[in-house]
């Protein structure tokens, strides 16, 4: 297992690769070492793919557009240069994407549940994040975090995850910025009206955390990142609670909300 952890760290160092549609944290600072215990790194032989969120010992929540072949997940990592003794690596056992997702629309129902090949153990640097008990309100202060680029216009990747505070914005702000976004979309609009803080390349699939609960999944946004007039778009976890709980309970035929 030690060899696997070292290999995983070496792979994460290969951060020259990032999906075009991925997102990352700009305008933030290094996360506190113990504030991202639920943050998961999805990687393959090319390097970083996405982030994810541990929601219990056996399940990870991420974005559907993060789906890839032959990826692994790394838990409990803070610095790419310093190994945490409690880091753990897992393979996906099962992956679930909304069966009613539009196949030709990457932005539609951008949510994926991953069942691990074996449960992870809670530790100093690993713990699940709670699912939402209610929908977040406009102006709520929420936390974003990830391994994505820290510069809005080019790909500069940090050695540690970065975190920043942003706000839940009225959905009309994102609809004005992105005409393709439907009024009834199960998404959250989040950012800062003055700009400068945003998820960006490399942060896709990571969490939007409000009051200690995962309320959103990093999905998509503008490039360059951090534009006040073009906030980030996040999959709204609260709207998908029934689907998430049904899948975990074994009802894999359930569909997501329209």
UniProtKB/Swiss-Prot annotation:
Active-site feature positions: 65, 110, 204
GO annotation (BP), single: proteolysis
Keywords: Disulfide bond, Fibrinolytic toxin, Glycoprotein, Hemostasis impairing toxin, Hydrolase, Plasminogen activation, Protease, Secreted, Serine protease, Signal, Toxin, Zymogen
MF terms (GO), sorted A to Z: serine-type endopeptidase activity; toxin activity
One GO cellular component term: secretory granule
Similarity comment: Belongs to the peptidase S1 family. Snake venom subfamily.
Protein name as annotated: Venom plasminogen activator Haly-PA
Organism: Gloydius brevicauda (Korean slamosa snake)
């Amino acid at each position: 297992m030690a060899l696997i952890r070292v290999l995983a760290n070496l792979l994460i160092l290969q951060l020259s690769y990032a999906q075009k549609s991925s997102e990352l944290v700009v305008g933030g600072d290094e996360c506190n070492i113990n504030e991202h215990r639920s943050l998961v790194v999805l990687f393959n032989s090319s390097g970083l793919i996405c982030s994810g969120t541990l929601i219990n010992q056996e399940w990870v929540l991420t974005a559907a557009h993060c789906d890839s072949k032959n990826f692994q997940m790394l838990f409990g990592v803070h610095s790419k240069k310093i190994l945490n003794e409690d880091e753990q690596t897992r393979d996906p056992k099962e992956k679930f994407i909304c069966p009613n997702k539009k196949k030709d629309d990457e932005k539609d129902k951008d949510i994926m549940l991953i069942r691990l090949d074996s449960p992870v153990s809670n530790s100093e640097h690993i713990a699940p994040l709670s699912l939402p008990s209610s929908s977040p309100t406009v102006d709520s202060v929420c936390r974003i975090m990830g391994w994505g680029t820290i510069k809005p216009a080019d790909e500069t990747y940090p050695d540690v995850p970065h975190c920043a505070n942003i706000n839940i914005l009225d959905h009309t702000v994102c609809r004005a910025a992105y005409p393709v976004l439907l009024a009834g979309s199960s998404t959250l609009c989040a950012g800062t009206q003055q700009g400068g803080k945003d998820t960006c390349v490399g942060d896709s699939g990571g969490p939007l955390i409000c009051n200690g609960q995962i309320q959103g999944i990093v999905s998509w946004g503008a490039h360059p990142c951090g534009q006040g007039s073009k906030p980030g778009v996040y999959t709204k976890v609260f709207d998908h609670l029934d689907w998430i709980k049904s899948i975990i309970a074994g009802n894999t035929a359930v569909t997501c909300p329209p």
